[in-house]
Amino acid sequence: VTLGRIVDLAIKDMNNMGAAMAPAAADTLRRHLMDTGRTAADYDLIISGDLGKIGHDLLLTLMMDAGVPLDAVRYVDCGMLIFSPEQDVHAGGSGCGCSASVLCGYIMRLFREKAIHRVAFMATGALLSPTFSQQGGAIPGIAHLIVLEADEA
């Protein structure tokens, strides 16, 4: 488990939660990899939920800037897994609903089928106060990470 820290990059657009949460996800993932001595390649999947397309791309950029490149095949986002690019959902899904659905439905099935053995799963969140945001306040983000592992046999 890697506990997240509140990260505030002064994102004020309450319609862009991915941009508000991606910096916290990048911070948590970077610290997790440093603390464990692992690399992104040590995981079958690295999953965020729910940054959506905008936050997903921003996380890739932030990690590259930090010298920890991720590939877009190994790193996936729950909102992007639930919705296809053809659907008009704009940035993503519903946050905790996306994370829970993907983890319990899709990821656990991959573990049962022995298709994956180690996953870094990051739940992301925005510390959003609609009133504060409407008054021009920033939206800090946070992300916590757990590693799920199964025997390879």
Predicted regions and their residues:
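Short glycine-rich phosphate-binding loop at a beta-alpha junction
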Residues: 42-49, 120
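Condensing-enzyme catalytic core mediating Claisen C-C bond formation in acyl metabolism
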Residues: 1-30, 35-36, 72-80, 118-123, ...
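Glycine-rich beta-alpha junction loops
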Residues: 3-7, 47-53, 125-126
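Short, solvent-exposed loop/turn segments at secondary-structure junctions
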Residues: 119, 128-130
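Soluble secreted/lumenal catalytic domains
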Residues: 105-108, 152
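Short glycine/threonine-rich loop-to-helix capping motif typified by GTGT followed
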Residues: 51-66, 131-138
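Conserved active-site "lid/cap" helical segment
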Residues: 6-8, 16-20, 24-42, 54-63, ...
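Conserved catalytic cysteine-centered active-site region
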Residues: 65-102
